[in-house]
Amino acid sequence: MKILLDSVYIHNGGGKVLLDMICEKISENGDIDNYFFLFDKRYQPISQILKNTNYKYVNSSESKRKEFYKTNSQKFKKFLCFGNVPPPILINKSVDVYFHNDLLIRPLLNNTSIINKIKLLLKKYYIISKNRKNYKWCVQTKIMSEKLSKFFKISRDKIHVYPIYVTNFLNINKKTDNSFLYVSNFAKHKNHRRLFDAFRQASNKIGHNITLNLTIDEREFKDSFYNKLTTNNNLTIVNHGISNKSKLNELYNKSKYLIFPSLNESFGLPLIEAVLSNCYIICSDKEYVYQIVRPSLTFDPNSIESISQSIVNAYKNIGLRKPKLLVENKIDTFVQHIQEYV
């Protein structure tokens, strides 16, 4: 009997990066035939999975998930729900839920619209309603473990911490002076508007050209203030679009600084990737940061002035220090955990 890897709702952003890594590791280990993959219709899997016949695409809805589980759950010995949400029906077998969305912890406090807050709140209560005492949960940091236990009422002994990231970044040290990189999507909590205003302000203070590199979806960038509002001649903004692993590696190698003003993260994978690529890290003074790295400089992400000043300080090498990685990659341990008793 196989393991079901259910990744419905995962198709972009950090969730997709994590899913790609897990699938790649399973393939490397030669264990791919032990799995059946239930994919979100919008997800494009790595090539190794496409060579395997044990997968199915479904629309991103609970009704479609439920339909699949009702028809097929008896075929599987173990279940990994990778999209934050437990099985839609009761499963009396081994179940792991991989939780990696900090926005679901306290939805009403998020920096997003009222409609999104309500949607997230309803999803949170749905997740709680579907949890069972025999289910295990996996997160990436100790703080996420504490939040999940407190706000979802899950016993601590049911939560396991597995930081997961790519370690084989090619560091060829071709840094471009005065180049900043922000790896993120355009979600509101990523804090792009304050970042844009801070860079406009900082470029005026510095008086020399600085470059901000982005990885936003091309359509969102075209419709955004980045493209519509004017900047001075000292600021160059380049959007590279949604980037694959190879392109990201190139961007990290060319960029001297990673700037990361995000207000909420369950992990913050670009912070780790930046350390491995020998970038300085200028980022939000937030708890999620200190769970995984010691940054080069920090700022108040709610203050345009604070972000702007940190950009100036980085440019002038004021208080700048080499960042340090604080977490060990547990991808092998995680995959072993999933395959336990199978």
Task: Identify the role of each PLM range.
Residues 4, 19-22, 31-88:
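Active-site donor-binding segments of glycosyltransferases and PAPS-dependent sulfotransferases
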Residues 4, 173-190, 196-199, 213:
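Conserved donor-binding/catalytic core segment of Leloir-type glycosyltransferases
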Residues 13-24, 187-201:
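A conserved mid-protein helix/loop that constitutes part of the nucleotide-sugar donor-binding site
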Residues 53, 224-246:
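Nucleotide-activated donor-binding/catalytic signature segment of Leloir-type glycosyltransferases, i.e.
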Residues 116-138:
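Membrane-proximal helix-turn-helix segments that form the acceptor-binding/catalytic region
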Residues 171, 316-342:
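A charged, aromatic-enriched C-terminal amphipathic alpha-helix characteristic of glycosyltransferases
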Residues 263, 275:
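Aromatic "clamp/platform" in nucleotide-sugar-dependent glycosyltransferases that forms part
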Residues 297-305, 309-318:
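Conserved acidic donor-binding segment of nucleotide-sugar-dependent glycosyltransferases
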